[in-house]
Amino acid sequence: MYALVKLFSFGTLSKFFKNMKNEDKKAIALTYRVGYTYFESWIESIANVRNLCAHYGRLYNAILSKTPKMYKQFSDKGIGNNRLYGVLICISLLVPNNDNWIEFVNFIEETANRYSYAKLETMGFPEDWKEILLDTRKYLKK
């Protein structure tokens, strides 16, 4: 099974997960410490963003058609689920806070500084966006 999943595209993986039995979805989502309904919407949203990037879609100021289910703690902070930042929140909850993720977040900051005319707010980034992305789990109840 693991070898088969390694061959899937992200879109195929999303569809495969959606068609699994709920108990299997729960077991997989549990390894990421999230609810399976959240996990399912997240991988579908991530696949959608991936497809936008792969097919020359626009992420800047884009309103996403496939939106991830957000934890209340994030929506209470004013983080929407229909912009890029909402999807980045989901990705940050699926990857460990390792060097690659930190490097990616720093790259976003460097790019935003280099192109100061491009406003991160148009993609749903709040003022404290970097702090949140680097430590998303602290916003979730233990």
Show which residues each predicted segment covers.
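Long, contiguous internal "core" modules enriched in hydrophobic/ aromatic residues
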Residues: 1-142
